[in-house]
């Protein structure tokens, strides 16, 4: 039995491949390298000592996905990471985001149906909750009040998967709503390597620490939070990857539709993260306070009870280890995967 990991060369996908391989699964990776490096998969093999099948494929194209399933009849489940994911870019390129992010899932579902594959894990996000009325956030909070096209593509895909699941009682779907993944594999061989200037806090801090950027821009210090900066639920990417292995095992019980938050249940402010990173790297991180960004919310963290009770999953790593592992990756790879060239 093999797991198809769509977008498996990406940040979360590559860490998930490691956890699947270490758990004894056969893995088939598909990626078009739009926002990933071929170096990643070599390093996954180096870390695990295991080989896997790879297809350079565009998951919006039927012929690419059909080829994978035709040549790998042992695929019994799909984990779907493939997506455009930059919030700011989604605002300026909504057509590209809706086309790519919705079609990736629709094409995979269509081909799965033809090949009698019945298990699907979807990489969703806590942004589907919009600005929550309260925290912590449970899975029954309302969704859909998203603030950007990226988040809306995730909410729309969740709705599509819910409808398809209702229509097909043989289909099992896990909607995993991630909070804020950070950190890197303990080896320092793989980590987060965004193209251009990072959109997310942790890779930005890491680039400042390694001297590639001058200072961190903190957007807003007038939120109703303990220090005025935005609070988020940061989760170690290795913990998040383990959650996908637990989700695959859940689908093997023929659970139908399963929705679950993957977060720690603890919120940390932007300044908390900066100070934790300063401890990890042993140097000050310069930052400047700027105006709030449109669409940002004050506070967002998970209630992880369902994941604990129904997946048997608990986040193991705290903010100190997340920062230490991010720094280990960045100092070993100051130019990301380009350092290997």
Language model regions located:
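Hydrophobic, Gly/Ser/Ala-rich alpha-helical and linker tracts in large acyl-processing enzymes
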Residues: 185-198, 205-208, 214
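Oxidoreductase cofactor-interface core, primarily capturing Rossmann-like NAD(P)-dependent enzymes
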Residues: 176, 187, 216-218
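Short, basic/glycine-rich phosphate-binding loops at helix/coil junctions
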Residues: 183-185, 222-223
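Short, flexible active-site loop motifs that bind/organize anionic cofactors or intermediates
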Residues: 7, 31, 55, 80, ...
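N-terminal Rossmann-like NAD(P)+-binding domain of SDR-like oxidoreductases, especially those catalyzing
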Residues: 1-184
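C-terminal substrate-binding subdomain of Rossmann-fold SDR/epimerase-dehydratase oxidoreductases
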Residues: 201-341
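Short-chain dehydrogenase/reductase
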Residues: 98, 147-155, 191-199, 203, ...
């Amino acid at each position: 039995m093999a797991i198809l990991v769509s977008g498996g060369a990406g940040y979360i996908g590559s860490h998930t491949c490691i956890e699947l391989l270490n758990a004894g699964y056969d893995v088939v990776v598909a990626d078009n390298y739009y926002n990933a490096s071929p170096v990643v998969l070599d390093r996954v093999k180096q870390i695990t000592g295991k080989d896997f099948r790879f297809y350079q494929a565009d998951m919006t194209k039927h012929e690419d996905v059909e080829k994978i399933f035709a040549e790998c009849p042992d695929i019994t489940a799909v984990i779907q990471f493939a997506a455009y994911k930059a919030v700011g870019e989604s605002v300026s390129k909504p057509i590209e985001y809706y086309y790519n992010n919705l079609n990736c899932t629709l094409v995979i579902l269509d081909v799965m149906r033809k090949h009698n594959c019945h298990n699907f894990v979807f990489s969703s996000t806590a942004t589907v909750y919009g600005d929550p009325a309260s925290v912590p956030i449970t899975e029954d909070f309302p969704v859909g009040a998203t603030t950007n096209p990226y988040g809306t593509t995730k909410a729309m895909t969740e709705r599509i998967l819910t409808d398809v699941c209702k229509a097909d009682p043989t289909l099992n779907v896990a909607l995993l709503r991630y909070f804020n993944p950070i950190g890197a594999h303990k080896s320092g061989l793989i980590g987060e390597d965004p193209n251009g200037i990072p959109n997310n806090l942790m890779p930005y801090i890491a680039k400042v620490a390694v001297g590639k950027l001058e200072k961190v821009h903190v957007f807003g210090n007038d939120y109703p939070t303990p220090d005025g900066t935005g609070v988020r639920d940061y989760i170690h990417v290795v913990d998040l990857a383990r959650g996908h292995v637990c989700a695959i095992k859940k689908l093997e019980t023929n659970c139908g539709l399963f929705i679950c938050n993957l977060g720690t249940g603890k919120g940390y402010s932007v300044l908390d993260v900066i100070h934790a990173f300063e401890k990890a790297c042993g140097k000050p991180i310069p930052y400047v306070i700027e105006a709030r960004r449109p669409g940002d919310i004050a506070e967002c963290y998970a209630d992880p009870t369902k994941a604990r009770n129904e997946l048997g999953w608990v986040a193991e790593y705290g903010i100190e280890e997340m920062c230490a592992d991010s720094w280990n990756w960045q100092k070993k790879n100051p130019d990301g995967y380009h350092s290997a060239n």
